[in-house]
C-alpha cells in the first residue's frame, strides 16, 4: 500500500509539470515529453454461485517518456506499477517517414486488435474476453509497417518469451503479420477490413505446454473462468479477422480470433476461438477519429459522451482434443464522459453466462456494475 501511495504522489507531481516539461533543443531536432496514466476502478458484483467480492483498486499506473529526434526518429520508455508491481511496458525505438515505420524493442506484435489498445483508450473497464484469451502480451522483437491510402501491411519477428521470464533454456520465437484493406476512406471517415496471423514455437522452459485463460470482462475479478491447458504442443498458429468502421459520430469494431495448436501424433490438435462486436455513438461535441498507421479508432475528444454496447463469445472447448476449457458469453453496455483531454470517467454494466465446463463453479450467470476515473497525459 505504501508503494502504491508513493507512486500516486509521484504521478500527481508528474502530471502537474507535464504540460510545461517538454524539453526541446534550440535547433528543434530533439524533444522529450513526460507521459503517464492512473486508473481508479470500482465494481459491484452480483453472482448466483461464485462469491465475487465488491472491490475498488488502483488498477493501472504508468510513468514514462517519449523522445523525438532528428525529425523521423522516436523512442519510448514506459513502466507499469499495477498492483504495486513494476513491469516493463512499451520500450522501443522507431523510425518513420510517414508511410513506413520500423520499430525495434519491447512492444506488441502486429497481430489482433483489441488487446493492443491501451488501457486508457479501452471502451470498457476490461478488454474483450476473446482478446485477452487469444491475444498476446508485449514481446521483444522487430516489426515493420507500410501504410498507404487503401492498404496497411505489418510484419514482425519476436521472441516467444516474456521479457520478465528468467527461466533458462533456448527461447522460442514468433512470426506475426497483419494486413488491412480500406474500401472506404474520406477525410476522417474510414472502413477497414483486416486479417492477421501468428506462428509461434515455444522455448525449452515451457515444456511443450500452452495455456489459454481469461476471466470476466473486468480487471477487478482475479478468477479465470476459462482455462485450457494444451499439453504435447509442437507449435501454435493464431488467426484473426477484423472490421473497424469510423463514420462521424458512429464507431464499430468487431474481431474473430482462433488459436490452433499442433500436438504430437498421439493426441488430437487443439482449437479454440471467439469473437466480439462493439458499437459506439458520440454525443455532445464528439466525433471519432482514426489512426491510419496503427489501424485503430481514436476517442471522440474533450466534452464528449460515448454510449457503448458490446457482445462477446469465447469458446475454449474442444471435444476432439479432450480439452474442455469452458465457454463464456457476455453482454456489456456503458458510457464514457471526457471532461478534457486528461480526465475521463467510465461506467458500465455486464452480464456474463458460463457453461458447465467453466472453471470456478461451472455453469452460472452473474452480472456487474463497474466504474472508472482515469487521468492520462
What role is predicted for each listed range?
Residues 1-22:
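Bacterial Sec-dependent N-terminal signal peptides
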Residues 49-50, 95, 208-377:
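Outer-membrane beta-barrel pore domains
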Residues 17, 86, 163, 261-263, ...:
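A short hydrophobic/aromatic micro-motif that marks alpha-helical segments and, especially, helix-coil
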Residues 13-14, 116, 160, 259, ...:
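Single-residue recognition of alpha-helix boundary sites
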Residues 21-163, 167-203, 281-287, 291-299, ...:
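Outer membrane beta-barrel
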Amino acid at each position: 500500500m505504501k508503494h502504491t501511495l508513493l507512486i500516486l504522489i509521484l504521478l500527481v507531481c508528474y502530471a502537474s509539470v507535464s504540460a510545461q516539461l517538454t524539453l526541446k533543443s534550440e535547433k528543434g531536432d530533439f524533444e522529450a515529453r513526460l507521459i503517464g496514466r492512473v486508473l481508479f476502478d470500482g465494481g459491484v458484483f452480483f453472482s448466483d454461485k461464485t462469491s465475487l467480492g465488491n472491490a475498488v483498486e488502483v488498477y493501472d499506473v504508468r510513468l514514462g517518456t517519449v523522445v523525438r529526434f532528428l525529425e523521423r526518429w522516436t523512442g519510448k520508455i514506459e513502466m507499469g506499477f499495477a498492483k504495486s508491481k513494476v513491469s516493463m511496458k512499451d520500450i522501443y525505438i522507431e523510425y518513420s517517414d510517414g508511410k513506413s515505420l520500423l520499430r525495434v524493442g519491447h512492444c506488441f506484435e502486429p497481430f489482433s486488435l483489441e488487446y493492443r489498445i491501451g488501457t486508457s483508450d479501452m471502451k470498457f473497464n476490461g478488454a474483450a474476453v476473446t482478446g485477452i484469451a487469444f491475444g498476446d502480451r508485449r514481446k521483444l522483437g522487430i516489426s515493420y509497417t507500410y501504410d498507404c491510402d487503401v492498404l496497411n501491411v505489418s510484419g514482425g519477428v519476436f521472441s516467444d518469451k516474456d521479457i520478465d521470464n528468467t527461466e533458462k533454456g533456448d527461447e522460442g520465437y514468433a512470426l506475426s503479420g497483419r494486413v488491412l484493406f480500406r474500401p472506404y476512406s474520406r477525410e476522417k471517415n474510414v472502413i477497414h477490413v483486416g486479417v492477421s496471423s501468428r506462428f509461434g514455437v515455444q522455448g525449452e522452459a515451457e515444456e511443450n505446454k500452452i495455456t489459454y485463460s481469461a476471466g470476466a470482462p473486468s480487471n477487478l475479478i482475479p478468477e479465470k473462468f476459462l482455462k485450457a491447458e494444451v499439453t504435447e504442443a509442437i507449435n501454435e498458429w493464431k488467426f484473426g479477422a477484423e472490421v473497424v468502421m469510423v463514420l462521424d459520430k458512429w464507431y464499430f469494431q468487431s474481431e474473430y480470433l482462433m488459436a490452433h495448436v499442433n500436438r504430437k501424433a498421439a493426441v488430437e490438435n487443439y482449437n479454440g476461438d471467439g469473437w466480439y462486436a462493439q458499437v459506439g455513438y458520440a454525443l455532445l461535441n464528439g466525433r471519432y477519429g482514426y489512426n491510419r498507421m496503427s489501424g485503430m479508432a481514436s476517442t471522440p475528444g474533450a466534452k464528449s459522451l460515448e454510449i457503448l454496447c458490446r457482445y462477446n463469445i469465447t469458446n475454449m472447448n474442444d471435444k476432439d482434443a479432450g480439452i474442455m476449457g469452458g465457454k463464456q458469453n457476455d453482454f456489456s453496455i456503458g458510457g464514457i464522459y471526457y471532461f478534457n483531454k486528461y480526465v475521463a470517467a467510465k461506467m458500465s454494466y455486464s452480464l456474463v453466462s458460463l457453461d458447465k465446463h467453466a472453471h470456478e463453479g461451472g455453469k452460472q450467470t452473474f452480472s456487474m456494475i463497474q466504474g472508472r476515473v482515469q487521468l492520462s497525459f
